[in-house]
Amino acid sequence: RRLQGTKGQGLATYKELIRNISTKTRPEGGALTLILDRWINAVQTETAAESDLTPDSLEFEKAVEKKIYAVINSLNEMVHGFDFSRLLTLYYRAFAEGDDETKGKVVKWFRGEYATKTEAKSELGVNIIITDEDWYEYIKLFSAFLKMAGYSGMLILIDELVNIYKIPNSITRQYNYEKILTMYNDTLQGKAKYIGIIMCGTPQCIEDTRRGVYSYEALRSRLA
């Protein structure tokens, strides 16, 4: 997989990462719906423990919503945070109403599977989709959300960096290495919180100064 490309290769990597998202109880991947549902269930359980409200009361529902929106609103200041928060709100409302169809559409959006804004607007009422240009921003949003949902954060594992090494076009290779540099800098500078990134490649695809990772001087100076 590539991290950047002219034909949606970066988005394809994002789709694979989200499709394979795993937890201890769902190690085989496909855990996104489980994570979202458990988050809402945990908020409901916490609300019940903190109050004498009955789960079927309007007051209980309002107390749960207050906690849900506290998490959602805290993401608004991040890049694309408002849109991400809006989708979380749609998911929560669908969960509360037992609307599995809308839940499925929101998960489809989170997975980056809407090809056009028109399609997303028609099905969800939102005029934005995840693209090759901004997919990494949504990874950062997911990591922040996961922290607030009770997890330690997100650990991303990307193997086969040799696929970037094999890209014949030098400019395209450089764009991919630039994306790695962005990730590296973000984690060190605190712009990407609660996220760990492990990338693997052969010694040659890392150390080759002609076309490997070390061919991008800004990376070589940091990693060598």
Language-model regions: role of each:
Residues R1-A149:
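P-loop NTPase nucleotide-binding core
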Residues D100-A224:
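The catalytic "switch" region of P-loop NTPases
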